[in-house]
A protein has these predicted regions:
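Loop/turn segments within WD40 beta-propeller blades
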Residues: 28-36, 73-80, 119-126, 174-181, ...
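A short helix->beta-strand "capping" segment at the edge of beta-propeller domains
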Residues: 2-24, 55, 307-314
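WD40/WD-repeat beta-propeller blade-loop signature
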Residues: 24, 35, 58, 68, ...
Length: 394
């Protein structure tokens, strides 16, 4: 971690981008290395924006969704394809070589399905989306063959549906970064399920069920060979599970805290107000967790078996809650986006190249930026279950 930790400690603002129209920045994805160097950002006004990753200049925008966006991700083997999912019941694929054009693929399932999470497998072959709960009963994992050309929707390309593993909104879907058949899903029912899709149907594919004890907000694969799962809950709980222990008698839980906000207090005492998310730093083989305060202050923390350790506090950037971040290992840069509509690029020893001081948002602008798509649910009723090594375990 030493080399990366030194870089994190030296971060300062290098670039700053603000849209003409105020909006919340909800999620960010980086185009795979070796391409034209694009960042995709999902916004609370249902648009997807493309930025140059080095200058943050806006290079394009996609409009087509009519509901809250639940994420964006670039394909790996076809990095000119960008996917976005939405509560409007569609997952759309865009060609980033033609900014502003219509989606080249539109994936749908049942008209009653509203997606609140999605992901693409590491082989780009399989697409999966998690739905909101329907009629206070069912929620679904929907699978498509992403290689089939689907325009106009209509449910074309749907391979199947899992319907028994969650009992509430499926807030997270995460494919394993290296294993195309390994999938993790998280829900407001408090459960994180791990599937091996090569094993057959839903019951056979379910390898483990872990209980977060609260509504699941974020799930990330991490650790050596990505054998661990980081789970952050909507009420700021943190859980780290080692799936490498599935076939042993050792416990899965590496670390667990029902409220992680005070685990790594900054110099002025207290703790963070919320957790933004986590990211596995491949080059350093360490897990980075980012937390923040409502005034925009950010705290970079390392997470391991001992809990959280503060690495760096970033100030003078955002003016309100930060909603997304990513670490660009090749570019040695941190990218953050938030409810103040700002996209920031932090680099070691960076000197801000945009003119003028940080513009404080007026209360009127803040109100204008609020929308149903931007409201992050902080707690939901959940069912109590212990984790299981597989579905047949007691």
């Amino acid at each position: 971690m030493e080399g990366v930790e030194e870089k994190l400690r030296g971060l300062s603002i290098a670039r700053r981008a603000r849209p003409e129209e105020p909006t919340y920045l909800l999620d960010v994805s980086l185009q795979p290395a070796g391409q034209s160097g694009l960042l995709a950002v999902s916004c609370s006004d249902f648009t997807v924006r493309l930025h140059n990753k080095d200058t943050l200049s806006l290079v394009g925008e996609y409009r087509g969704h009519s509901g809250a966006l639940c994420g964006v991700t670039f394909a790996r083997t076809s990095p000119d394809l960008l996917y976005s999912g939405s509560a409007d019941g569609t997952v759309r694929a865009w060609d980033v070589r033609r900014p502003g054009t219509e989606a080249v693929q539109v994936f749908k399932s049942d008209p009653s399905h509203h997606y609140c999470s999605f992901d693409l497998s590491c082989s780009d072959a399989l697409l999966c989306a998690g739905t909101e709960q329907l009629d206070e009963e069912d929620s679904f994992l929907v699978f498509w063959d992403a290689r089939k050309t689907v325009t106009g929707g209509g449910g074309g390309g749907v391979l199947g549906v899992y319907s028994e593993s969650h009992s509430d909104d499926i807030t997270q879907v995460r494919f394993h970064p290296r294993d195309k058949d390994r999938l993790a899903s998280g829900s407001t029912d408090g459960l994180v399920n791990v599937f091996d899709l090569s094993l057959g149907g839903e019951e056979e594919a379910l390898r483990a069920t872990c209980n977060s004890g609260s509504s699941v907000g974020s799930v990330r694969w991490c650790g050596t060979d990505y054998s661990r799962l980081l789970c952050l809950s909507h009420d700021e709980g943190l859980h780290l599970w080692d799936l490498g222990q599935l076939d042993t008698d050792e416990p899965l839980t590496v670390f667990s805290a029902p409220d992680a906000r005070g685990l790594a207090p900054p110099a002025d005492g207290g703790g963070v107000d919320y957790l933004v998310g986590g990211s596995w730093l491949e080059e350093a083989q360490r897990l980075l967790v980012v937390g923040g305060r409502s005034d925009g202050e950010l705290h970079l923390m390392e997470c391991d078996e001992e809990g959280l350790r503060l690495l760096r506090t970033l100030q003078g950037g955002h003016a309100s809650t930060v909603r997304c971040f990513l670490w660009d290992g090749a570019g040695e840069a941190l990218v953050t986006g938030g409810e103040d509509a700002q996209l920031l690029l932090w680099k070691p020893g960076g000197e801000e190249l945009t003119s003028g001081k940080r513009e404080e948002l007026t209360s009127g602008k803040r109100e204008a930026m609020k929308s149903a798509s931007a409201l992050k649910l902080k707690s939901r009723p959940h069912k109590k279950h212990g984790y299981q090594r597989d579905k047949k375990a007691p």
